[in-house]
Design a protein with these regions (language model features):
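Cys/His-rich microdomains that often coordinate metals
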Residues: 24-27, 59
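Cysteine-rich micro-motifs
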Residues: 43-60
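Generic short beta-strand segments
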Residues: 26, 30-35, 47
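Short cysteine-rich clusters marking metal-coordination/redox-active sites
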Residues: 18-23, 52-55
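Short, intrinsically disordered terminal segments enriched in charged and Pro/Gly residues
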Residues: 1-17, 33-41, 61-105
Length: 105
């Protein structure tokens, strides 16, 4: 098993399913361990990226939407920018977070 595959399996946590835009079917999605941070003017969006296990199509699960940067703790914001795997795993195992993003598990 490749190191990359082992890391992906490690971060999968709760098995998450979603209709894949690439495959067109309900597929298992895996926590990539990566965050996407987008600043638009004086607002910030933060997503946790999941990938389709079959075709690698991405699905962004929203953590913060159109939030003022000061509302996000500075240490947490730095962890998002650094793609901290422990933080990604915490979110991936948080059922409330998954429910907010309409994930099936």
């Amino acid at each position: 098993m490749s190191r990359r595959r082992a890391d992906a399996d490690l971060l999968s946590g709760i098995k998450v399913y979603h209709k894949c835009g690439g495959c067109g079917r309900r597929q298992q999605f895996v926590n990539s361990g990566k965050f996407r941070v987008n600043a638009n003017g004086n607002r910030v969006d933060v997503w946790l990226i999941y990938r389709c296990r079959k075709c690698k199509h991405s699905w962004n699960l929203s953590i913060y939407e159109r939030t003022r940067p000061g509302k996000i703790p500075a240490e947490t914001y730095e962890l998002f920018l650094a793609n901290d795997e422990e933080l990604a795993e915490e979110y991936g195992n948080d059922k409330k977070f998954l429910d907010r993003n309409n994930a099936e598990y």
